[in-house]
Amino acid sequence: MGILDGKRILVTGVLTDSSIAFHVARLAQQEGADVVLTGFGRLSLVERIARRLPGPPPVLELDVTDEGHLGSLAERVSAHTDRLDGVVHGIAFAPQSALGGNFLNTQWADVATAVQVSAYSLKALAMAALPLMDGGGAIVGLDFDASVAWPAYDWMGVAKAGLESCARYLARDLGPRGIRVNLVAAGPVRTMAAKSIPGFADFEELWPKRAPLGWDITDPQPPARACVALLSDWFPATTGEIVHADGGAHAVGG
């Protein structure tokens, strides 16, 4: 028996098979869960990637900035399962002008995009899934340490700080419904999304040196396993928490 036996999990944010969300979906299936994926934009690509999972799951289109997509999500998911026990938020995006050392000159429209897609979408996704979570469950989001100002991360760092605050407020308001809300702050992993961040090479060099446990930037397993653990029943009284799966780098000075 796996720790997710019988659970139904919605996983967002799969872009390629290097995505942390992909490995969350794979591990969730291996631990007994039924999985539904969402994709944005190039849906056929996500469908091809989904076929690499142990059991190819259904893939639904979801643009978290589209009220129509959000409003119909529960109905579309219910075509495949009558409930959700867990939701994984693996969605983040910032325009290039909001990254790479341009912090002081970034225009509000680009800041707003980063915050809406990377932070507000946690609340939007939670509310969209809520009709299928009458029995309680777990919402887990993927995070990156927002306690300091990282080189080149700029407005994405601000958005991640917003994500962390959003998770705490959701934990407060969804707790009475039996829904736990937690984040996993991953160390840098060489994904397609990460490669688009200017200065990511600096993280690749810095992190293994800082992390007391070491850090492999090619291995998405540590954060994926943390997500699966939080989706399980093994943390029944944990909510509003940020679990760092980063080799311990967050705990030590530079």
List where the protein language model places each region.
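C-terminal helical subdomain
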Residues: 120, 183, 202-238, 243-247
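Catalytic loop of short-chain dehydrogenase/reductase
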Residues: 13-20, 93-127, 135-176, 188-191, ...
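Canonical Rossmann dinucleotide-binding motif of NAD(H)/NADP(H)-dependent dehydrogenases/reductases
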Residues: 2-37
